[in-house]
A protein has these predicted regions:
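Transmembrane-helix bundle of Major Facilitator Superfamily
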Residues: 2-156
Length: 157
């Protein structure tokens, strides 16, 4: 019975890692994937050049500015709570971006998406750190970090 429980805990750890890696993949992919859509955004929304620049940069700006705050709030309020909050903000803003009627809405949605990412990313690493025992932690964090490279390659396709 004890071995079976340990097996289930092991499976749960790897499913947790998969979820955290997926979240990180989405965060990193959204960092630059919008570059591919810039001609369509300009054509369909009538975006100006400065609007296109803001569309690209506002996500990174809000993400970078709030990343440490997201980590600290995760320490204070709980990593799981901050992760779920970040997922909700990220998902809702992604939907809003998809239905953006104009350039201003698109930029605002990308800013809010960056906020969601800033709350999610530190929580992903923190959750992995507490989920895995020390002897498996390096492999788990290496897998997590590999998602950054995978997302960077994927965004150009």
């Amino acid at each position: 019975m004890t071995d079976r429980i340990r097996l289930n805990e092991g499976n749960r750890r790897w499913w947790t890692l998969a979820a955290m890696c997926f979240a990180l993949f989405m965060i990193m992919l959204d960092n630059t994937v919008v570059n591919v859509a810039l001609p369509s955004i300009q054509r369909d929304l009538g975006a100006s050049l400065s609007g296109l620049e803001w569309t690209v940069n506002v996500y990174t700006l809000t993400f970078a500015v709030l990343l440490v705050t997201g980590g600290r709030l995760g320490d204070i309020l709980g990593r799981r709570r901050m992760f779920l909050f970040g997922v909700v903000v990220f998902a809702l803003s992604s939907a809003a971006i998809g239905f953006a009627p104009g350039q201003g809405w698109l930029v605002a949605g990308r800013a809010i998406q960056g906020i969601g990412a800033a709350f999610m990313m530190p929580a992903t690493l923190s959750i992995i750190t507490v989920t895995f025992p020390p002897e498996e932690r390096g492999k788990a964090i290496g897998t997590w970090a590999g998602e950054i490279g995978r997302a960077s390659c994927r965004e150009r396709v």
